[in-house]
């Protein structure tokens, strides 16, 4: 998703500094390039969107923007995924992809390993301590080296993070499933899936038809899940996680019919003390006891 810094104050009195250009198809359709003057409007009076390009104001030396055909980090070819607008690096060993995968895994929406910052992740990947997510739970075996090199900080900081990682082994299995980074499987989908398959290991035996029986899991999502759990490297990684004591089981929950059963809650606009994610979590927790 490409964004261009702007400085605009609209008639509603709000400042607009960014407007999304979505993907290369959208950029091509608009014929927008570097240095162009654009017209921006608020979709639904909320979301800034680019409406058109003022080509009569196009500067000398104008350049069309093109997404690179090689990865800027590892140099491997990039390719567009079938039936999507996503362009990705084709190398399975790309350090940038591994870094983003680990950042997603330890993030709040997944395993929620607090204090595991991006700077630490980048350095641990660069030095070879982390090659996949299972390596995270073996960092304790390198405690002395980590302290000596100061990768996470001094002894106190290192021990604190290692303790947090150890505690994360007890997380509900939906958090682990979210952290795998399977396309189309976010936190909400992971929770729904784990209600149908109470163990991560059950997903290794599930076929596409069984996966599609889960609410909100369509053909594309089912195929992504199936391919992930039938990939030999992923199977080895999951086996390592299990041997390291990472929980594979979902917490048992009781389903109770109520006045809000089957309803969809939509959060829009802004709240003075809560972000969107915090508000969603509050609603979800309240509905558990409704």
Named regions from a protein language model:
Residues 3-10, 289-290:
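Conserved small/polar residues in nucleotide/adenosyl-binding loops
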Residues 13-25:
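Short, structured beta-strand/loop micro-motifs enriched in basic residues and often containing a Trp
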Residues 24-31, 256-257, 274:
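Short, surface-exposed secondary-structure edge patches
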Residues 39-48:
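Short, charged beta-turn/beta-strand-edge "cap" motif at the junction between a beta-strand
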Residues 48, 52-110:
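Cys/His-rich short segments
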């Amino acid at each position: 998703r490409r964004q261009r810094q702007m400085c605009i104050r609209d008639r509603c009195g709000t400042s607009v500094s960014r407007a999304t250009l979505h993907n290369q198809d959208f950029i091509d359709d608009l014929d927008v390039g570097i240095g162009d003057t654009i017209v921006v409007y608020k979709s639904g009076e909320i979301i800034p969107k680019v409406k058109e390009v003022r080509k009569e104001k196009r500067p000398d030396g104008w350049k069309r923007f093109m997404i690179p055909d090689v990865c800027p980090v590892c140099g491997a070819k990039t390719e567009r995924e079938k039936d999507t607008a996503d362009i990705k690096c084709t190398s399975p060993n790309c350090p940038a992809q591994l870094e983003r995968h680990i950042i997603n895994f330890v993030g709040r929406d997944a395993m929620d390993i607090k204090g595991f910052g991006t700077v630490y992740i980048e350095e641990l990947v660069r030095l070879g301590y982390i090659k996949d997510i299972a390596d995270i739970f073996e960092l304790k075996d390198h405690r002395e080296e980590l302290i000596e090199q100061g990768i996470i900080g001094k002894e106190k900081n290192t021990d604190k993070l290692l303790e947090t990682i150890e505690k994360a082994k007890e997380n509900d299995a939906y958090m682990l499933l979210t952290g795998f980074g399977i396309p189309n499987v976010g936190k909400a989908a992971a929770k729904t899936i784990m209600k149908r398959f109470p163990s991560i290991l059950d997903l290794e035996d599930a076929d596409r038809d069984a996966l599609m029986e889960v609410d909100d899991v369509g053909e594309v999502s089912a195929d992504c899940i199936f391919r992930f759990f039938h990939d030999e490297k992923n199977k080895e990684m999951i086996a390592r996680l299990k041997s390291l004591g990472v929980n594979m089981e979902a917490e048992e929950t009781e389903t109770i019919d109520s006045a809000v059963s089957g309803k969809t809650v939509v959060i829009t606009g802004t709240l003075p003390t809560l972000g969107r994610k915090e508000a969603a979590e509050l609603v979800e927790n309240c509905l558990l006891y409704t």
